[in-house]
Design a protein with these regions (language model features):
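A generic local structural motif
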Residues: 4-6, 61, 147
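Sec-dependent bacterial lipoprotein signal peptides
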Residues: 1-27
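Mature, soluble, non-transmembrane domains
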Residues: 26-28, 50-52, 83, 87, ...
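A short, structured loop/turn motif at beta-sheet edges
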Residues: 69-70, 90-93
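Bacterial Sec signal peptide processing site at the extreme N-terminus
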Residues: 19-41
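Post-signal-peptide N-terminal segment of Sec-exported extracytoplasmic proteins
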Residues: 43-79
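Short linear interaction motif-like sites in intrinsically disordered regions of transcription factors
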Residues: 10-12, 41, 56
């Protein structure tokens, strides 16, 4: 009886240690440096694009709608057939994922948001602290954060190509010129 109880306590201790280790794994994932900014401005902003993402042997193609009213920037992704893929918001400090479909559960949204903002948001790089450096060569911007090369952005007409060197993934952003208008 005492031996059985001792074995249970050892098992519980191992289980607790494993749970603590696993919960710590999330904090070991790299954070998207260069995303948060204390200079985030309240403004009205709207943009619509078609995105193609190549990540981890997966390929996603979707429409992305960005809309900011005040401090909160919302991003909504729809499949080309209209299915909602994910919805998130960014307030200058945090990315809050509100909804996402199962195949996108592991997509590194902090990096995706950061890279989209560097590529499309007006003057986003200027909102960053001095640890962010941008080197321009021809049509390509190289983004360095804490002296580490993290992102390449190539502008070609209405197409922007992103190459994230940290995660890694590639993204092509094509601007939609026939914008959907909202009436209120």
């Amino acid at each position: 009886m005492v031996l059985n109880l001792q074995a249970k306590w050892q098992w519980m201790g191992l289980l607790l240690a494993a749970l603590l280790c696993c919960s710590g794994c999330q904090s070991l994932l790299p954070k998207a440096q260069g995303l948060t900014t204390t200079a985030w401005l309240a403004q009205d902003y709207q943009r619509q694009d078609q995105l193609e993402v190549q990540w981890n042997k997966h390929s996603f193609s979707f429409l992305l709608y960005q809309q900011q009213q005040g401090q909160k920037l919302d991003m909504l992704a729809l499949s080309l057939t209209g299915q909602q893929l994910f919805k998130l918001s960014f307030d200058g400090q945090n990315v809050q994922v509100e909804q996402r479909i199962e195949p996108m559960k592991l997509l590194p949204f902090e990096f995706v948001v950061r890279d989209i903002l560097y590529a499309t948001y007006p003057n986003f790089a200027q909102l960053q602290p001095q640890n962010v450096q941008i080197k321009n060569v021809a049509q390509t911007q190289s983004i360095f954060i804490n002296q580490q090369h993290v992102l390449n952005i190539k502008h070609q007409d209405a197409v922007i190509e992103l190459d994230n060197l940290q995660v890694p993934y590639q993204m092509v952003i094509s601007a939609l010129h026939d914008r959907l208008e909202t009436t209120e």
